[in-house]
Amino acid sequence: MTPDIRPLVAGNWKMNGTRASLDQIKAMAEGVKGDLSARVDALICPPATLLYVATALCDDSPLMIGAQDCHQKQSGAHTGEVSAEMVADCFGTHVIVGHSERRTDHGEGDALVRAKTEAAHGADLVAIVCVGETEEERKAGRTLDILKRQLSESLPDQATAENTVIAYEPVWAIGTGLTPTVSDVEEAHAFMRRELVSRFGAEGGKMRILYGGSVKPSNAKELMGVANVDGALIGGASLKADDFLAIYRAYEELTA
């Protein structure tokens, strides 16, 4: 954790979830409440097909709803795409950009991630910008070089602590059950903090840096207690309300 930074626990449902899954979001909305919700933010990013209904379920809850991606353009002949304005029109508050699965499956590079981040900001959304190294890059000792490049090229100059969140996701840890050591996570997050402060000054010191990569109830408290880890971006464990809320409630002791 970073003193004076409000943590964010975010769930990315990826290509999972139909209307039958809305009961999980309802349970999450009911579980995110009380004193903890005044200290820790919670967010779920379901498929775009569920955005509007999900936000309606959270009308009386602090649980926020966001999108998993957006197009870099406001509108136009881009079949199958969803713009940041459309996300905002569904009352979404955040959008994930640059997730490793987008970078790998769709060949999205840093320049495109930067354009999507700018589009999110233009729609008054908070951009969750994902960065992280592959297994090959890690074995070659290039983790910090990759993070430096991705932060430099994916973040626009107008990024602030209010409109931008960083998510560190070691690609080799996503969906594999593998997790970096606490010291590895601490080193990566400390490095990113220094890079953000170097570029953005005091504003960079206030930006939230989430950890993502096989986060689950059993390791959440340990990971989220690491210096400069300001929350989590959760994959599979966010599909079930019990698991998501267990991770969220790990902050009961951490923020007490």
From Swiss-Prot:
GO terms under cellular component: cytosol
Subcellular localization(s) per the UniProt record: Cytoplasm
GO biological process, one term: glycolytic process
Keywords linked to the UniProt accession: Cytoplasm, Gluconeogenesis, Glycolysis, Isomerase
Principal cellular location given in the protein's record: cytoplasm
EC number: 5.3.1.1
GO MF: triose-phosphate isomerase activity
Biological pathway: Carbohydrate biosynthesis; gluconeogenesis; Carbohydrate degradation; glycolysis; D-glyceraldehyde 3-phosphate from glycerone phosphate: step 1/1
Active site: 99 (electrophile), 169 (proton acceptor)
Pfam families: TIM
Catalytic reactions on record: D-glyceraldehyde 3-phosphate = dihydroxyacetone phosphate
Chain residues that bind substrate: 12-14, 175, 214, 235-236
Domain of life (superkingdom): Bacteria
Family: Belongs to the triosephosphate isomerase family.
Subunit: Homodimer.
General function of this protein: Involved in the gluconeogenesis. Catalyzes stereospecifically the conversion of dihydroxyacetone phosphate (DHAP) to D-glyceraldehyde-3-phosphate (G3P).
Protein name as annotated: Triosephosphate isomerase
Organism the protein comes from: Rhizobium meliloti (strain 1021) (Ensifer meliloti)
